[in-house]
Amino acid sequence: MKITHAMIIASLLASSSAFAAEKIVVINAISDVGVGKIIGTVKFSDSDKGLVIDPDLGELAPGLHGFHIHEKASCDVAEKDGKKTAGLAAGGHFDPLKTSKHEGPDGMGHKGDLPALEFKEDSSATRALLAPHLKVADLIGHAVIIHEGADNYSDTPKPLGGGGARLACGVIE
């Protein structure tokens, strides 16, 4: 009987660990007036290769969009130089090691640099991505932001990859 109880407890512990290694985040459109409608979800899950990112998103323009984990768990508008900016309350790119380098998901710079999201002609993004230097536990208490344009993972010719305005956001709790 003790073996059966031990097996049940081990099974419960294993299943609770599996749940801890996955987060589904609701993504909302954002603008300089605040958080707007839901445009989809992103599922983050741990794998032996890193963080697997499964987007199920719509309603953004076709093409590549910069995609990052940001410092703070907020999608709110904030003001900079007297101008209200969408999602600015999320802060900058998640950079816990203070590298101040923008090197992309495979580099050793900001841990918040994710692979670019590709939105298809029907305005959807569903292709899975991999961030090799992250795990689900790293994301808790931060926001994920989708930018207007592509990201070149460099600070030249524009800072932070030149992704442009923040268009969508989700808080990772």
For each of these PLM feature ranges, what is it?
Residues 4-5, 112:
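Hydrophobic alpha-helical segments and their boundary regions
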Residues 6-15:
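Bacterial N-terminal signal peptides
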Residues 19-173:
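N-terminal leader/targeting pre-sequences
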